[in-house]
């Protein structure tokens, strides 16, 4: 069994994790709010955590954040998966129609951590 699965229980916030990431990709103006509320380890899925770590790092270095720059930075960091990363980013954009509710999504992710 995957050691990560043994150490963590499945939270009920996977959709909220995806919506947080999608919001940051849609509108980089919400990134400071998210960075103030969530840490990379708050993301349960490895793929979500790697995307968030990438955005988090880009934010800390005042780099522009959008789907193209994030995918490029993921390649630089060695966390880009040729089979999945591009499609997953596209999926995040598709399922997140607006960044307006990003603080609520962050709260849902945060509250799921309390129940682990």
Please identify what each model-predicted range represents.
Residues 1-112:
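Noncatalytic partner-interaction/assembly domains of nucleic-acid and motor enzyme complexes
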